[in-house]
Amino acid sequence: MNIEKTDYINSLLDIYAELLTPYQQEIMDLYYQEDLSLKEIADEKEISRNAVFTLINRVEKILINYENKLHLLEKRKRIQDELDNEINLDKLKEKIELILDE
């Protein structure tokens, strides 16, 4: 599994997991947090490996769609960049307000 993709999906899960069903959350947690294989998840849930694969791909697309519409991860990263780079608190407050108003 690609580490960059894993980090990206984990970041999306941090933000949007509550918008998923409990079952979707559980499968994604087993795959991305617990690092179980598709087969291990399939065995544990008594479903086919293909069903796990399909569900994970579907949820990944859902998460990416949420981000494309809401941009919460992008805003979080931009705010963190401003926090890392800005010393003047008044300027920082203005920049964060601009980001959140978008």
Language model: regions and residue ranges:
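Hydrophobic positions on the alpha-helical face of helix-turn-helix-like DNA-binding modules
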Residues: 41-42, 52
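C-terminal flanking helix
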Residues: 60-67
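Intrinsically disordered, low-complexity basic tails/linkers immediately adjacent to helix-turn-helix/homeobox/MYB/SANT
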Residues: 71-92
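Residues within the DNA-recognition helix of helix-turn-helix
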Residues: 55-58
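Helix-turn-helix DNA-binding motif, specifically the short coil turn and the N-cap/start of the second
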Residues: 48-49
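Helix-turn-helix DNA-binding elements, focusing on the entry/boundary residues of the two helices
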Residues: 37-38, 45
